[in-house]
């Protein structure tokens, strides 16, 4: 029984150490289809490689939060880092600017990544 207790203790200690690990998210902003002015599309913000899991993601239009946004379930990779996809339907045009704003413990201030329609 003593070996079992020792192994259980080691597992618990290693799991508690995961909370101390912090990885900044990688942020990718892209449209589902190539951008065409006046043609409906989907704006995606893929946030990956972050730890811990607490994160706030907003899609922005001209600097203002878009309210009707959906997202995937929080998932994790083999290395225990997390990833999410936030998306919304939008119709691009020449004047509007779109971006993704992410708040995470690894950032001192929220990070905003603009959508590049040519990507």
UniProtKB/Swiss-Prot annotation:
GO cellular component assignments: extracellular region; MHC class I protein complex
Localisation per UniProt entry: Secreted
Extent of the signal sequence: 1-20
Keyword vocabulary terms for this entry: Disulfide bond, Immunity, Immunoglobulin domain, MHC I, Secreted, Signal
Domain Ig-like C1-type as annotated: residue spans: 25-114
Gene Ontology terms describing biological process: antigen processing and presentation of peptide antigen via MHC class I; immune response
Main location: secreted
UniProt subunit comment: Heterodimer of an alpha chain and a beta chain. Beta-2-microglobulin is the beta-chain of major histocompatibility complex class I molecules.
Family: Belongs to the beta-2-microglobulin family.
Purpose: Component of the class I major histocompatibility complex (MHC). Involved in the presentation of peptide antigens to the immune system.
Listed name of the protein: Beta-2-microglobulin
Lineage of the organism: Eukaryota, Metazoa, Chordata, Craniata, Vertebrata
């Amino acid at each position: 029984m003593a070996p079992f207790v020792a192994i259980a203790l080691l597992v618990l200690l290693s799991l508690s150490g995961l909370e101390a690990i912090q990885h900044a998210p990688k942020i990718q902003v892209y449209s589902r289809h190539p951008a065409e002015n006046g043609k409906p599309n989907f704006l995606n913000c893929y946030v990956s490689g972050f730890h811990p899991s607490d994160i706030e993601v907003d899609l922005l239009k001209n600097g203002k939060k878009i309210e009707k946004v959906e997202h995937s379930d929080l998932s994790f990779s083999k290395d225990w880092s997390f990833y999410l996809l936030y998306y919304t339907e939008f119709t691009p045009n020449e004047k509007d600017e779109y971006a993704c704003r992410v708040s995470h413990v690894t950032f001192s201030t929220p990070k905003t990544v603009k959508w590049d329609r040519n990507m």
